Regions:
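Glycine-rich, mobile lid/loop segments that gate access to catalytic sites or pores
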Residues: 74-78, 82-153
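Catalytic core of soluble alpha/beta enzymes
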Residues: 158-268
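Long, contiguous hydrophobic alpha-helical segments, chiefly transmembrane helices and signal peptides
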Residues: 1, 31, 69-73, 81-84, ...
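Structural signal for hydrophobic packing residues in well-ordered secondary-structure cores
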Residues: 31, 35, 39, 68, ...
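Well-ordered, non-membrane alpha-helical segments in soluble/globular domains
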Residues: 13-27, 139-155, 183-195, 217-227
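Conserved active-site and cofactor/substrate-binding residues in soluble primary-metabolism enzymes
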Residues: 59, 63, 67, 71, ...
Length: 268
């Protein structure tokens, strides 16, 4: 299993930085004895055991739990002669749907050339774009992002190889919209709604419009933005990321109707 953490460890309410050399002795001392000789005929009981296990009063780091769950799932699949997908579907009593799921392509700072590559490859959702700086990427009035969304939709509509290619635009703004509008959810929503026409009919998702610095305020602000978008009749969708990491976080954000989508990173 890959004991991997998310890119921004320690930020937005996440577990602290995970360094393998610090945790290998811990795994050898505390986890290895629990794995040797363990029954792996079923995955779910083992996954739940390690997910709730506490050592010295602390839950295992999310990266450790992620790696362990991968290894345990693989072990169950090998032991029972099934694909890992089949194990998950069987144990959660889910249907086996033989269809592809949309893939999200991420450009990083290469937000122009990478988009051309994504268009040619027919990526379902694009481009992330890494809008994490007001001056260079968003603009103090949001003008740079507005121009980018228009360029993005123009590029897709002019360079796509099939009229059936109709991707979703998903842009992560790292809380920068909140910065230029003084964390006012109504002004944030009005700006976000104004981007819809620049997308020229392509579905538009804005991830992390604000970063409130804590979970309760993040839920409050995202809820207000989402409600205002609905009132304005906007089709732009809000994606929660920061402060929405664990299963319980996801429950809390969605119960508050604070967003249209949650950005779930598998190690979280």
């Amino acid at each position: 299993g890959d004991c991997a953490a998310v890119q921004y460890s320690g930020a937005g309410g996440r577990d602290p930085l995970f360094l393998a050399e610090h945790f290998i002795p811990f795994l050898n001392d505390h986890i290895k004895p629990l794995l040797v000789g363990r029954d792996v005929d079923a995955f779910l009981p083992n996954a739940r055991f390690f997910d709730k296990l506490r050592i010295d009063g602390n839950l295992l780091h999310t990266a450790v739990r992620y790696g362990l769950s991968q290894a345990l799932l693989d072990a169950t699949a090998l032991a029972t002669g099934r694909l890992k997908t089949e194990v998950v579907c069987d144990e959660w009593q889910l249907p086996r749907v033989a269809e592809s799921i949309p893939l999200f392509g991420q450009s990083g700072d290469d937000r122009y050339i990478a988009v051309d590559k994504m268009i040619l490859k027919g990526i379902d959702v694009l481009p992330h774009a890494l809008i994490n700086n007001v001056e260079e990427k968003l603009g103090f009035k949001g003008e740079k992002l507005r121009e980018y969304v228009r360029w993005l939709s123009d590029r897709i509509l002019s360079k796509r190889t099939s009229a059936r290619y109709y991707p979703t635009l998903h842009i992560d703004v790292y809380g920068t919209i909140g910065l230029i509008f003084d964390m006012d959810p109504l002004r944030c929503a009005q700006y976000i709604a104004s981007l819809e026409k620049e997308a020229q009919g392509l579905p538009l998702y804005i991830e992390g419009p604000v970063d409130a610095g804590n979970k309760p305020d993040q839920i409050r602000l995202l809820t207000a933005i989402t409600k205002e978008l609905t009132r304005l009749g906007s089709g732009v969708k809000i994606v929660a990321d920061e402060w929405c990491n664990t299963y319980q976080d996801i429950v809390d954000f969605t119960d508050a109707a604070s967003c249209h989508m949650v950005q779930i990173k598998t190690p979280d």
